[in-house]
Design a protein with these regions (language model features):
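Short edge beta-strands and adjacent turn/loop segments
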Residues: 23, 27-56, 88, 93-96
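Short, well-ordered secondary-structure micro-motifs
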Residues: 18, 64, 99-103
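Active-site acidic-Proline motif in GNAT/NAT acetyltransferases
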Residues: 59
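Short, non-transmembrane amphipathic alpha-helical segments
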Residues: 63-82
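N-terminal presequence-like segments and adjacent domain-start helices
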Residues: 1-18
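Hydrophobic C-terminal alpha-helix "anchor/cap" residues
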Residues: 16, 20-21, 78
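Short, charged, intrinsically disordered terminal tails
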Residues: 79, 83-86, 94-103
Length: 103
């Protein structure tokens, strides 16, 4: 049988969000003014998938290392769950949580 299967951008955004939130130090996804699904934007240009995540992180985390871990986890998750290879996974840290009390 011939045909095509398509996975909606909303589903891909949910996968990316779930993967990002698995990383230690990621506190939440941050919604912005541009339309995106709970802090995640998926673009699909002729089958080329790009992911942009806007995150809030915990105080004191190593932001570059956390961002790299999110990129890896999201790319692996999309490959495993949707059989897609993202051309890019961009991580934007928009918020840092407050320092712990007494710090």
């Amino acid at each position: 049988m011939e045909g095509h299967s398509l996975i909606s951008s909303d589903i891909l955004a949910s996968y990316a969000a779930d993967a990002a939130l698995e990383i230690d130090g990621v506190a939440r996804l941050v919604e912005g003014t541009r339309p995106r699904h709970h802090g995640v934007r998926i673009t699909n240009a002729d089958g080329v998938i790009a992911v942009e995540l806007h995150l809030g992180v915990d105080w004191g985390v190593n932001i570059p290392a956390t961002g790299a871990a999110v990129q890896t986890r999201v790319a692996e998750y999309l490959e495993r769950m949707a059989d897609l290879t993202a051309s890019s996974v961009d991580v934007v840290v928009d918020d840092i949580g407050p320092p712990p009390e007494g710090a």
